[in-house]
């Protein structure tokens, strides 16, 4: 009830787990079940965890070493102001060119069985890479036009770390699937997958259960940390310090 109250849009279906990687794997299964397709796209230098599926969506050499990627996992370049691939005449990032590349990549490098995108709102292990403000709104629009789903891995960026419950709120974007962790349990092993209302039944088809996920103690810890964030105005505090740091 608390999550449905504070999360944006129609994110109203929830399943609880005990690690970020497990939540990511569950989110990937939701994408497949909801879309009835299998391929997924992430970005170079993303990090989503260290189990087989999550590793296949990542680009960290130490995590991938000695492991074979799951077929159907693709990576594309991410807008990066430090090393942009495409820019406008004024030197700003040409987001439209990135989106056009994604469209061309899907057409020529996949088997046309793409479920959607799985991305970090702000890249963590890849170097704290912040996207241009128009990137996720345009990617959301592209996904809607092409019938693709958008999953935001907010394990690192969510739960107040950027001054919002979800980092995606900064751009007014509601993902179809969101993974939440780390600050969610404030050190306690509590994570969550949140999905938009049309996809809640996908939890049933993927047997979305976990031996320890959602146990009463973990849920109590997550609820308590959430209430502290609210009561002590920690969202506003993080946003204020973030603005100062970016200066």
Where do the protein language model's features map onto the residues?
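Conserved N-terminal phosphate-binding loop of PLP-dependent enzymes in the Aspartate aminotransferase
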Residues: 1-247
